[in-house]
């Protein structure tokens, strides 16, 4: 009687996880609609409500993991333990973790569609932080699923762990488990910075193994509808990798023994793009398997679509990625809100180092619109980096450069908005030329900035004193590109002054 009872219990729970899988799929549908609606309803700039409400609203609108990951965890785990005892039915809940991990891959792939996300209406880079945290969560619960069964089989004297793990369907699960387990360590920030290429390859192999092997491993099957949804998303991604890609020639590369490199690409092969757009370059042809396996390199286009060339301004490692030759442009995508380009009236652009590539094309486009206020500030380490301006076709009247040599290592560090005291100057020796009353170098060269500040940090309140007008906040934009410290200062300034804010992270 006990044996028949056990058989009955086992058979009755075989399909017990199917409703939960459908529930998680419903959560994904609801969450997708939530993302779209919140992006449309919540204004992009801080408004004059309480600071915590502003912070909450922007966290929702920008898909910040700080808000969205707890929301997702709450939605998927509230009904996780239901009807069956956790202790008595541990196998059921381990299987449920595996099913949860697989179904959430649908959302994770959805977040990474590019060049622009056609479903959610976000820019590709907007969703990268959420994608990273969701990937970690999916990986961890997938690993818990695998390790949980290994421990269970090891502790059960009635079964052999080896024989269980080497059964066909279970062994396929083990194969899918291995790259996920390695990925958990390879995704650590230290390793990613040390060898992003190896991390990316492991990431690709891990996701392919999970998407295509788990449908064979899982019982009951996850083929319908989950695998077919993922297959459709992968086909969409594959088509975009082919349709949007094109071959391009790098025709010129100028280094000039400085930290910044100017690269010129042939214009004819690239479709039109918006100012501030990025492109991703691959060394491989589309027919080469490495095209699909190896990471691409993102660069920002510093020129406008109506120019005869494509300009890139990059900071390279010892081994340059881009040399004169042939490359594949995987896609071209924009992260700039259209309202900045078409509706703005007052714009301040603050960039550091190679971040000039992001700000430059926006600046050149806005120069054609006759705005009420336009200022472009570029923070660099060395005066010699200004050689880049000789290759860029634009009016430098509204450009100011801050040469920060002999200041702290972060070449784009700015003066805190809460700090008191005078700006710091170093002992840079330079030829005495015409200077304004603050000590800034005045130039008349059409290829030189209107003002060059030596050894001085940017003081947001002083140097942007004419930027903010209370009656024009809706159409006022602060654009920042550079390292985290610059973006943090810029975002703080935008919050305090209730203007629109666009940021782009460059680890320069």
Swiss-Prot record:
Q: Which GO terms describe its molecular function?
A: ferric-chelate reductase activity
Name the UniProt record assigns to this protein: Probable metalloreductase AIM14
Residues in Ferric oxidoreductase domain copies? 97-214
Q: What is its membrane topology? A: Multi-pass membrane protein
* Record-linked PANTHER family: METALLOREDUCTASE AIM14-RELATED, NADPH OXIDASE
Q: Where, by residue number, does the polypeptide cross the bilayer?
A: 18-38, 70-90, 100-120, 137-157, 168-188, 198-218, 222-242, 347-367
- Give compartment(s): Membrane
Keyword annotations: Electron transport, FAD, Flavoprotein, Ion transport, Membrane, NADP, Oxidoreductase, Transmembrane, Transmembrane helix, Transport
- Which biological process annotations from GO are given for this protein? reductive iron assimilation
Please name the InterPro entries in this protein's record: FAD-bd_8, Fe3_Rdtase_TM_dom, Fe_red_NAD-bd_6, FNR_nucleotide-bd, RBOH/FRE
Might you give the EC number(s) for this enzyme? 1.16.1.-
**What Pfam families does the database record attribute to this sequence?**
FAD_binding_8, Ferric_reduct, NAD_binding_6
Which enzyme type, at the first EC level? oxidoreductase
The signal peptide, as residue positions, is none
Question: Main localization of the protein?
Answer: membrane
């Amino acid at each position: 009687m006990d044996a028949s009872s056990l058989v009955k219990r086992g058979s009755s729970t075989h399909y017990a996880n199917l409703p939960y899988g459908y529930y998680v799929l419903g959560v994904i549908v609801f969450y997708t609609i939530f993302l779209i609606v919140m992006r449309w309803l919540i204004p992009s700039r801080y408004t004059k409500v309480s600071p915590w409400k502003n912070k909450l609203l922007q966290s929702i609108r920008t898909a910040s993991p700080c808000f969205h990951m707890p929301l997702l965890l709450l939605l998927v785990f509230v009904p996780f333990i239901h009807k069956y005892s956790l202790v008595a039915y541990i196998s059921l809940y381990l299987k449920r973790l595996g099913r949860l991990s697989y179904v959430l891959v649908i959302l994770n792939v959805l977040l990474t569609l590019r060049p622009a996300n056609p479903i959610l209406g976000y820019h590709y880079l907007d969703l990268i932080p959420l994608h990273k945290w969701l990937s970690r969560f999916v990986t961890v619960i997938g690993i818990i699923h695998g390790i949980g069964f290994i421990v269970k089989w090891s502790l059960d004297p009635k079964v052999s762990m080896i024989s269980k793990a080497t059964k066909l369907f279970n062994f396929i699960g083990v194969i899918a488990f291995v790259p996920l387990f390695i990925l958990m360590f390879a995704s650590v920030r230290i390793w990613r910075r040390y060898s992003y290429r190896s991390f990316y390859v492991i990431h690709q192999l891990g996701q392919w193994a999970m998407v295509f092997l788990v449908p064979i491993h899982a019982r009951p099957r996850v083929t319908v509808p989950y695998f077919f949804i993922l297959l459709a998303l992968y086909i969409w991604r594959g088509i975009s990798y082919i349709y949007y890609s094109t071959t391009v020639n790098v025709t010129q590369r100028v280094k000039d023994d400085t930290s910044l490199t100017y690269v010129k690409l042939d214009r004819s092969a690239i479709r039109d793009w918006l100012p501030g757009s990025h492109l991703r370059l691959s060394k491989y042809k589309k027919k080469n398997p490495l095209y699909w396996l190896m990471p691409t390199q993102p660069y920002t286009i510093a020129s406008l679509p109506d120019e005869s060339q494509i300009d890139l301004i990059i900071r390279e490692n010892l081994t340059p990625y881009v040399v004169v030759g042939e490359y594949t442009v995987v896609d071209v995508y924009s992260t700039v809100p259209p309202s900045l380009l078409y509706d703005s009236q007052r714009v301040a652009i603050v960039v550091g180092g190679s971040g000039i590539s992001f700000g430059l094309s926006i600046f050149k486009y806005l120069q054609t619109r006759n705005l009420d206020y336009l200022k472009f500030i570029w923070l660099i380490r060395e005066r010699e980096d200004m050689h880049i301006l000789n290759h860029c076709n634009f009016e430098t009247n509204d450009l100011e450069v801050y040469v920060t040599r002999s200041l702290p290592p972060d070449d784009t560090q700015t003066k805190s908005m809460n700090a008191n005291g005078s700006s710091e100057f170093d002992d840079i020796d330079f030829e005495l030329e015409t200077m304004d009353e603050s000590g800034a170098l005045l130039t008349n060269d059409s290829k030189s900035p209107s003002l060059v500040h030596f050894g001085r940090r940017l003081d947001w309140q002083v140097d942007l004193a004419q930027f903010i007008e209370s009656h024009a906040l809706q159409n006022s934009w602060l654009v920042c590109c550079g390292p985290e410290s610059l973006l943090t200062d810029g975002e703080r300034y935008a919050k305090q002054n209730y203007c629109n804010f666009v940021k782009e992270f460059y680890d320069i």
